[in-house]
Amino acid sequence: MCIRDRYLVTAAATMAQFAAIEALSAGKDDAQPMKVEYLKRRDYILEKMTELGFKIIKPDGAFYIFAKIPEGYNQDSFKFCQDFAREKAIAIIPGVAFGKYGEGYVRLSYAASMDTIETAMTRLKEFMEEHAEA
């Protein structure tokens, strides 16, 4: 092998290869408890936001909810999220951050503790009640 090839041919370290074998053979079910927990969090948010009038397609493989802001509220997703953050100290992401077709939507993560999610949903309900257009 010439000197040049020594720097072009690489592989994972032997230790890392053995660790990968162990993880793939013995750790197949290690993620199952977290999967159950994430589904619980997702379903809780879906229920609470649907009650508030958000339209949501249930995600099957992500840690995020992408929800349509209900009619009768400011449809400017950036302003909606900015006002919510300022008034309720909870961050959600405006849909427009994901492109022009995301306008009118918001994105929330459910990769947070259940306590944090419950607080966020309580504050979102308060915010929606305070900002409903008559």
Functional labels for PLM-detected ranges:
Residues R4-A134:
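PLP-dependent class I/II
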